[in-house]
């Protein structure tokens, strides 16, 4: 009963906050400057990570680029240097905790305190539970989730000490809405979204107001990791479009970025719709891509 009374007493605040949010829709938020900030991007040798590096280079940030692919990393670094940025590269296996901690130690000693951390590195296996090998499941969680813990533990203390920083989690719409035959990937991205939300709340509980958090949750992106993707929610997203939205979200300090925005509506529907209706709705959305179905192979 006391809890219900407390909720009722908060209704005036709910009305004020709702009006405030509505008004903000029509007032563009000022973008912050990232000139001179030390920005570390994991998975910078390809796709979203590479394009994000280009955008920070244009904004005169100092770049620290990590990737397991040395050739891709060097290509990204060369373009960023051509844009006038100072660039440092490290070949890092984000599935290896000790590799992450070792590289982080070098970054802090040789370059300085990272003030913007973009946890972008990721892997995906398009297969059902039976066709996904145990090492693939382990690697999915090591790269897509656990690496976020290790990088954040390495670089967040300095941000908290300075009360200045930004942790960016590149997740997925699959971190909010489940997709068959992406079991390991969806599970890891649900965990990544949970990491972002809980880290945000921990920082608030500790009254660390200067360290911001942003989570990116796009639909299928045309980066080549998933073959022949399609969905009735819209066309496959181009990396440039996603990175433009990501940069806007970082610079305006948005907490959650859904691309397309209809994903946010879908996540709300999933919580309130009857299960039977929701099952029909998911079939209508018609998510398709090339996948290996191990269950059928076992049955043959």
Curated annotation (Swiss-Prot):
GO molecular function ontology, one term from the record: estradiol 17-beta-dehydrogenase [NAD(P)+] activity
Recorded coiled-coil stretches: none
Entry EC no(s): 1.1.1.62
Cellular compartments annotated: Endoplasmic reticulum; Lipid droplet
Pfam families the record matches: adh_short
GO cellular component: endoplasmic reticulum; lipid droplet
Function as written in the Swiss-Prot or TrEMBL entry: Can convert androstan-3-alpha,17-beta-diol (3-alpha-diol) to androsterone in vitro, suggesting that it may participate in androgen metabolism during steroidogenesis. May act by metabolizing compounds that stimulate steroid synthesis and/or by generating metabolites that inhibit it. Has no activity toward DHEA (dehydroepiandrosterone), or A-dione (4-androste-3,17-dione), and only a slight activity toward testosterone to A-dione.
Protein's UniProt name: Estradiol 17-beta-dehydrogenase 11
Species the sequence originates in: Pongo abelii
Primary gene name: HSD17B11
């Amino acid at each position: 009963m006391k809890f219900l009374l407390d909720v009722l007493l908060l209704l005036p605040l709910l009305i004020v906050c709702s009006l405030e949010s509505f008004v903000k829709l029509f007032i563009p938020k000022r973008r912050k400057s990232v000139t001179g900030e030390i920005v570390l991007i994991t998975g910078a040798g390809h796709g979203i990570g590479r394009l994000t590096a280009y955008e920070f280079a244009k904004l005169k940030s100092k770049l620290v680029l990590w990737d397991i692919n040395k050739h891709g990393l060097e290509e990204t670094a060369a373009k960023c240097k051509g844009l006038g940025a100072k660039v440092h590269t490290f070949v890092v296996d984000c599935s290896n905790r000790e590799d992450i901690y070792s590289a982080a130690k070098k970054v802090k000693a040789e370059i300085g305190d990272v003030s913007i951390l973009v946890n972008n590195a990721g892997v995906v296996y398009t297969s059902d539970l039976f066709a996904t090998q145990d090492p693939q499941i382990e690697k999915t969680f090591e790269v897509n989730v656990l690496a976020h813990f290790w990088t954040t533990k390495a670089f967040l203390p300095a941000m908290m000490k300075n009360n200045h920083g930004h942790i960016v989690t590149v997740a997925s719409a699959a971190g909010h809405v489940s997709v068959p035959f992406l079991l390991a990937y969806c599970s890891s991205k649900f965990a990544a979204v949970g990491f972002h939300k809980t880290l945000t709340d921990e920082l608030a509980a500790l009254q660390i107001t200067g360290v911001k958090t942003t989570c990116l949750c796009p639909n299928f992106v045309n980066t080549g990791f998933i073959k022949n993707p399609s969905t009735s929610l819209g066309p496959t997203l181009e990396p440039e479009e996603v990175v433009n939205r990501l940069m806007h979200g970082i610079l305006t300090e948005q907490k959650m970025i859904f691309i397309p925005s209809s994903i946010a509506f879908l996540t709300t529907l999933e919580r309130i719709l009857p299960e039977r209706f929701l099952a029909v709705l998911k079939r209508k959305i018609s998510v398709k891509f090339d996948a290996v179905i191990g269950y059928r192979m076992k049955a043959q």
